[in-house]
Amino acid sequence: MIGVILVLASLLSVGGQLCQKQATRPLTVGGRRRHLMLWLGLALICMGAAMVLWLLVLQTLPVGIAYPMLSLNFVWVTLAAWKIWHEQVPPRHWFGVALIISGIIILGSAA
């Protein structure tokens, strides 16, 4: 169960980051203030929920085990930026993502 909470905390944190990115996207028509408030509001909600879940994780797992798992955030953000905004991700970056996933598997199996 704590693993699910950890993944959810990570996804909510990433969601907050992605909402912040979306808030900075240019608009072709009016409504900039509304756009900004919507996405920043969603970012605050996601980040706040992630923090609450993170505190639950820290009550159960040692920080030395839990914290490295947040490296998943780099993986989620890379995938989302590539898929949502069609950002270019060079092969070297994909290799780094693979290394992060490998490290998480190694650390997770030690827990």
Swiss-Prot record:
Cited Gene3D superfamilies: 1.10.3730.20
GO molecular function, one term: carbohydrate derivative transmembrane transporter activity
Chain segments annotated as transmembrane: 38-58, 61-81, 91-111
Keyword terms of this UniProt record: Cell inner membrane, Cell membrane, Lipid A biosynthesis, Lipid biosynthesis, Lipid metabolism, Lipopolysaccharide biosynthesis, Membrane, Transmembrane, Transmembrane helix, Transport
Gene Ontology cellular-component terms listed: plasma membrane
A single BP term in Gene Ontology: lipid A biosynthetic process
Domain of life: Bacteria
Pathway named in the protein's UniProt entry: Bacterial outer membrane biogenesis; lipopolysaccharide biosynthesis
Membrane topology category: Multi-pass membrane protein
Pfam family, one: EamA
SS bond partners: none
Domain EamA: 40-109
Function: Translocates 4-amino-4-deoxy-L-arabinose-phosphoundecaprenol (alpha-L-Ara4N-phosphoundecaprenol) from the cytoplasmic to the periplasmic side of the inner membrane.
Subunit structure: Heterodimer of ArnE and ArnF.
HAMAP family associated with the record: Flippase_ArnE (MF_01869)
Record NCBIfam families: PRK15051.1
Name under which the protein is recorded: Probable 4-amino-4-deoxy-L-arabinose-phosphoundecaprenol flippase subunit ArnE
